[in-house]
Curated annotation (Swiss-Prot):
It comes from Blochmanniella pennsylvanica (strain BPEN). It comes from the Bacteria. The keyword tRNA processing applies. Residues 218-383 form the TrmE-type G domain. K(+) binds at residues 228, 247, 249, 252. Keywords: Cytoplasm, GTP-binding, Hydrolase, Magnesium, Metal-binding, Nucleotide-binding, Potassium, tRNA processing. Its EC number is 3.6.-.-. Binds 1 potassium ion per subunit. It is found in: Cytoplasm. This is tRNA modification GTPase MnmE. Exhibits a very high intrinsic GTPase hydrolysis rate. Involved in the addition of a carboxymethylaminomethyl (cmnm) group at the wobble position (U34) of certain tRNAs, forming tRNA-cmnm(5)s(2)U34. Its cofactor is K(+). SUPFAM superfamilies: P-loop containing nucleoside triphosphate hydrolases.
Amino acid sequence: MNYTIDTVVAISTPPGRGGIGIIRISGKSVPEIAPKLLGKIPNPRKAEYLPFLDTDGSILERVIALFFPEPNSFTGENILEIHGHGGQIILDILLERILKTSSDIRIAHPGEFTKRAFLNNKIDLVQAEAIADIIDATSYQAAKSASNSLQGIFSRKIYIILEQLTNLRMYAESSIDFSEDEISIIPYEDIKKKLRNIISDVQKMYKSTYHGVLLREGIKIVIAGKPNAGKSSLFNALVGIDRAIISTISGTTRDTLHEYIQLNGIAFHITDTAGLQKKSDNEIEQIGMKRTWEELSNADHILWVIDPNDVTNKENDITLKHVEKVLFCKNKKTPITIIHNKSDLTKNQIGISIINNYTIITLSALFNDGTDLLQEYLSNNIKSKIQQDCKSNLSENQGNFIARRRHLNALEKSSKYLFSAQTQLLSTMSINELFAEDLGLAHKELSKIFGKFTPDDLLKRIFSTFCIGK
């Protein structure tokens, strides 16, 4: 079904000079517009070299034209693509000429071509988002994973869960309808088993989706520890520039600093923080420590930096245990790696060891000695974790997929309703309306991933982040 009545046009290539410039037109008026511009309607799905005509019939440009009749096109509508020279002036001239050919043609909004593809059921909302994620990818792994999402890997896994949930809802509703007749549509134990399997699948999918979010947004690494432990030196060494001021004076860093790096195709967001201590009478230091706690609460991985002079100091252990306690209370199991810094002073051997279930890396941040070991450890650790958590959900040849926070929220809400349904089922030992209602709410939350039951303002916000011409 075609949801649009007007025709839209936009330059699809980036602004500026280039070898080729592309203009895309989509809508019902394309067959009417094409002869005015090209003297004919190009043969479907075949590249044709044609003159691009002005209003008086003179040739403005010679172009390659491609015509895709509805419904077999990206948007599901008639599409005409004009491939000409890549100068901005000539593209603007061609665009102005196109806008004069019909009264119902207008400039496309950002992401409108992709939105039309979604509205015309050519792609689902996850695939639409994957298109934007491919364009915006900041690492090789993110681009590859976004491509997997575009191919439908993520969508297929969710659709399977939705199908299972639909069948369970059908059994539940039927059992309720025939309860007065004492007709058992499906045994109670079978219902319980099916629900348990769905909950398990949703939880596995949540893990995989979480790592899909990390691949899209980047892994948040927070560097923390006591004042003057060498946190800023480590930050500078990891990001490759002297971004943070370093000094022997305790408490030099008062605010958080953020930088982005790539390690083996994975995006990392490195954050330097103010030092943590038991107490401080300095108001600025107090604000800095408050921000450090905020960063730690949102970290995907923590690097806890220790000054060699404080290794035997119990305050380091007390502060670290306090960090772990706070994170535990917030239901966060953030991995922590301990960094024994300043090996240039202690002459300790650079390397990796495991002590009391902590991974400990000895290095010299100031002299950038051993930081390559840390970088390799971080990238390998993240890759291993992603592969391990996704292994039960995806076959080896499928690979990872990209995901967004809203997908996580939908899975989390759906899981809560499923657990509520399970509680209802086990407590009453029967299939009732409350059980069926929880299943319906879980189904609705999962369906939001694909744009069903999704508010128009959210759809508008999603597509507004796209490029014009996409």
